[in-house]
Amino acid sequence: KQPRGKYDILLSDSITDHMLGSRQLLQQLCTRLGVEPGVPRSDGRVTVDTTSCTGLCDQGPALLVNGYAVSRLSEQRIEQICQLIETATETSQWPAEFFAIEDNILRRDLLLAEETTAASPDGSALRALIDNGSDALLDTIEKSGLRGRGGAGFRTGMKWRFCKQAEADSHYVVCNADEGEPGTFKDRVLLNNYADSVFEGMTLCAGIIGAQQGYLYLRGEYRYLLDPLHARLQQRRNNGLLGQG
């Protein structure tokens, strides 16, 4: 494993960040800190490198510092970051606005429904699953015409029925939150403000297809969402909406 500095900085290398001037900011950062991209500084304090799309193209250019996202980069903000690094200021003491991530959703429409109900589902769908059974809920989902958010728009009910009918010793629910396509940030928005809906959907799916376990794949660029997601999971367990894992 390549050694990294105490401050491990990764600038987004997506085409949208390039268009917003990220390459010039990378050069400024390296020159100011006296480092070459990918090579730790001799004192071990800092490493500067690039990474794939950080999912922040709507507020780029962006970078990650020790796994935490900093958006809306400018020459001034890069200079401020360099000063904080040179004075060995812990990232917990950096200005809070550096780490502010906005969702930038102008129209929610049907994809996100009402903000209050979508962000904090009341468990009524889980009660319907328990009261009416998995077959009835699956029929409802199929009749609704609900489709996945991926480009193919595959019918959710059809996919779940295939999984339910598949012969296997165990079934699992997997939520793939890896989005690396430049300009894409839908998963970030869902996990940032609609995690309860995501977890409730996974729980419903598990009840329908007969799964006892679920997994959410979180890309490295979204590492800063991990602790809040764990907190949401624990809250759902405390509220009786999720098993103990």
PLM segments and residue spans:
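Feature of Fe-S/electron-transfer and energy-metabolism proteins
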Residues: 1-245
